[in-house]
């Protein structure tokens, strides 16, 4: 008799996606981050659901409701810190996942890549709105500064900002709508994940060599399920350690002060995972120019497939491109550090140099070095 997993209308979808799925035999641990992101999303939706049961999206009570969750709700502090640090884990996995795609040339699957970019924007929007909800000082001022950037859009900017705020400043209407969207967006992200997987399974996975692996495939289960479970355990161990030993390591102390529109914090900055983009924004003295650079710092991923000049797909056998890739990683770390520093000498000039280098590496150096490598191999 045929196995039920191969005949049942629902189970056969699961079977063809996670059990009998043909996968390249050479996938390294860099291919674990897709499944880790799935676990992160599940953790965020579950903890967020329970937090939403106790949270109130009103400026008068939001800060106190978060305090109430931490002090009075059974294991509320675990939920709150799992959710806050889970976001950090989410972004660590996201950036490593995108980095893997850049290194191994996975961006040549353009549909999967473009849906991935949409996912990145959706997750960033969700995280930004979530940061506003505790209604601490950094929540309030972060929301004010970042939403105010839209006023740089010519003609409609000011009206657009007031429309998003629901008034003439960040207030109760803003908090309520941010909570509504923060609750809704993870489900949009989940739907996009399904589209992402649908496109991926149309083409099959890439592999470290970048060479078609149709002749050497193995079933996803048990080989990659067991490998993914090891990844889950390692990530959840790291997350638990962070939550139980130093839950505020990645947060901002200013957010333990209730929001006060009359007192500006000495240094307004977003969460650590947005600092690289924030540094690029600040490095341009013009407001509209800064906003464009901020958007382009992520949107540049969409034109990476067009800039692929190499005859090889992966960077595995391209040492010159590898050097440039790791230089790009170093530049991103530098930008993250600069984004957390005050706007003063020498941080301003370092930020400007790193921002220029970031765009130069992706737009100019990578394509040029690929052409050089082709010539060296007489291609």
Curated annotation (Swiss-Prot):
Residues the record lists as binding a ubiquinone: 201
GO biological process terms on file: mitochondrial electron transport, ubiquinol to cytochrome c
Keyword Heme: yes
Keyword line: Electron transport, Heme, Iron, Membrane, Metal-binding, Mitochondrion, Mitochondrion inner membrane, Respiratory chain, Transmembrane, Transmembrane helix, Transport, Ubiquinone
GO CC field: mitochondrial inner membrane; respiratory chain complex III
Bilayer topology annotation: Multi-pass membrane protein
Entry annotated with the keyword Mitochondrion: yes
Binding positions for heme b b566 per the UniProt entry: 97, 196
Protein location: Mitochondrion inner membrane
Obligatory cofactor(s): heme b
Transmembrane regions: 33-53, 77-98, 113-133, 178-198, 226-246, 288-308, 320-340, 347-367
Stored SUPFAM superfamilies: a domain/subunit of cytochrome bc1 complex (Ubiquinol-cytochrome c reductase) (SSF81648), Transmembrane di-heme cytochromes (SSF81342)
Cofactor details (free text): Binds 2 heme b groups non-covalently.
Gene Ontology MF annotations: metal ion binding; ubiquinol-cytochrome-c reductase activity
Summary of the function given for this chain in its UniProt record: Component of the ubiquinol-cytochrome c reductase complex (complex III or cytochrome b-c1 complex) that is part of the mitochondrial respiratory chain. The b-c1 complex mediates electron transfer from ubiquinol to cytochrome c. Contributes to the generation of a proton gradient across the mitochondrial membrane that is then used for ATP synthesis.
Additional notes on this entry: Heme 1 (or BL or b562) is low-potential and absorbs at about 562 nm, and heme 2 (or BH or b566) is high-potential and absorbs at about 566 nm.
Quaternary structure annotation from Swiss-Prot or TrEMBL: The cytochrome bc1 complex contains 11 subunits: 3 respiratory subunits (MT-CYB, CYC1 and UQCRFS1), 2 core proteins (UQCRC1 and UQCRC2) and 6 low-molecular weight proteins (UQCRH/QCR6, UQCRB/QCR7, UQCRQ/QCR8, UQCR10/QCR9, UQCR11/QCR10 and a cleavage product of UQCRFS1). This cytochrome bc1 complex then forms a dimer.
Family: Belongs to the cytochrome b family.
PANTHER family: CYTOCHROME B
Protein's UniProt name: Cytochrome b
Protein encoded by which gene: MT-CYB
